[in-house]
Structure formats: structure tokens, C-alpha cells
Amino acid sequence: MCGLFEFPTYFYPYDISFCHGVLPTVTSSASPSGNRTRARKSLGQHFLADTRIAGRILEAADLSPDDVIVEIGPGRGVLTKRMVDRVKRVVAVELDGELAEALPSRLDFPANLTCVKADARDVDLTELIAPDTSYKVVANLPYYAANPIIRRLLESEPKPDVLVVMVQQEVAKNMVAQPGDMGILSVATQFYARAKMVCSVPPKSFRPPPKVTSAVVRLDVLSTPAADVASEEGFFTVVRAGFAAPRKQLRNSLSQGLGIGPIAGGRVLEEAGIDATRRPQTLDIPEWASIYQVWAKTADDGMEGA
């Protein structure tokens, strides 16, 4: 078993010998007592400085004394210091080596804090969370990495019970969108979780302020996906195909995306009970599942590409 489960400590650089299998993504010779306040533009850093917003995030996370929290992007610890006194354990994943090393000392070395220097896009949660452990994720995500991190968490094992994430407002709107305004991100998010907008976050809430407004979203992860499909990979192949040309009617966008021709695409939609003139953004997840099921069957039967 990985040493992260066995030894009380505060900072793991993630390349230590007893927690092998993941290489460090950032190296730093900074002292753990370092107190850097300047954000690194190359890492997309914007430090949360608004205590009111911090309170909204923690309220949305609905913390309890038995909670295990994975915090992604703790930065200078504005959220971390409020969580360590309220939950069982906090595992903080920070890409910036200097900040990762400084965080435990900044918070007076709380016994229930483990800080890991790693890229959340690559981190193996099984190295951080004991098997069968329920956990929540609280994250202030850099804009450039938000989508892959959220996708990795939703597709991971073990999955979190709840995610409370700070993302760009436009991304947040896409995550919670309803039929009529849905996109690939909407379908991908809501296939795995119920999504709820918590609040908007103005640029002035950060140091330095970003150029765009952010938002906090809560995701309650479903015990089973929103649709029962034989292959999640196949399901999302169909969804991506449908959104290949989102302004076109489904008959054309789906046919183009799957490379099956408009006649065959029309037949798939007809058998699935979907009006071929609809736009992809109007479909809900069960309707996408119906299209996938017909497509998978006809593909197995050798669909003509006409």
C-alpha cells in the first residue's frame, strides 16, 4: 500500500520512493517556508482573495467532520485553512512546487493535511485515497485545465461523491445547460452528475484579477450514469458526431460526424424516434442514448454508408 496511507506527514513531492508510479510535473528548490504572493501566469494562477466567495464554496460543499476532501489548486490556502478544522482529512493537490511546499507551514502543520505536488490532469487518485473511501472535491481550477480535470474526476475510480469547482463562467453555464442550449460539455457532465450553479465570481475576487468572470458549480455524482449504455466510449462517439456541426440539423451533423451518409443518418434517427430536423443542442441524454443504441445495432449489422 502506498505510504500516503501509512505515515503522518504534510508534504509529499509525489516522486518519493514509497509512492511510485507518477512522476513530478514541477520541480522547485524553494524553502517550505516560502511566502510567494505573485501568481505565475504560466500556470494560469489567480488566487482567491474574497472571503465571502470562500464561504459560498464551503457552504456548497456541505462539509461534515467525517469528510475526506481532495482540494485541487489550493494556492495560498484560503480554502484549505477553513477546511482542515472542519473535516477529517484534506488532500491538497498543487502543481506549483513552491506553493505545495509552503502550504503546510503556512497553516501551522495541521495533522490532517496531506499536500501533494502533482498535475491534477495526471494524478492517480488511487495513490491518494484509500479504497472504498467516500470523498468530495473542492477545486479552484485554472481555465486552461478545467475540462480535462473535471472529466478525469467524473470518469475516475473511485469517483467523488460531490465536486464543487470554480471555473470560467461560460464553462459553468455549459455544464448546467438544459436541452435547447446543451453542448458536448453539458452532456458529458450531466451523464455522470447533477449540475447546479452556485454563484458567479467577479474578477475582483482574485489576485491578480482574471479578464473574465468565474462561477462556482456543484456536481452531485450519480451512483450510475444518467443513461444505461453498453459502451460509454461508443455513446460519446455518437454525441461528438452529433455536435460536429452544431448549427446543422441532426440528420446532417450526425451523418457527417459518423461518416455514414445522410440517408443512413436519417434512418438511425427515425428508428430512435428523433426528428431529423432538430439541432443537437435540443436533445437530452436519454435521446442521445436512443440514437447510440440504434447506431450501435446498425453498425454491428453492417450499415450502408449511403
Question: At which residue positions do the language-model features occur?
Answer:
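Short helix-coil junctions and helix-kink-helix linkers
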Residues: 255-257
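Catalytic cores of RNA-modifying enzymes
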Residues: 11-241, 270, 274, 281, ...
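Extreme N-terminal basic, low-complexity initiation segments
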Residues: 1-12
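Primarily a LysM-type cell-wall glycan-binding module
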Residues: 246
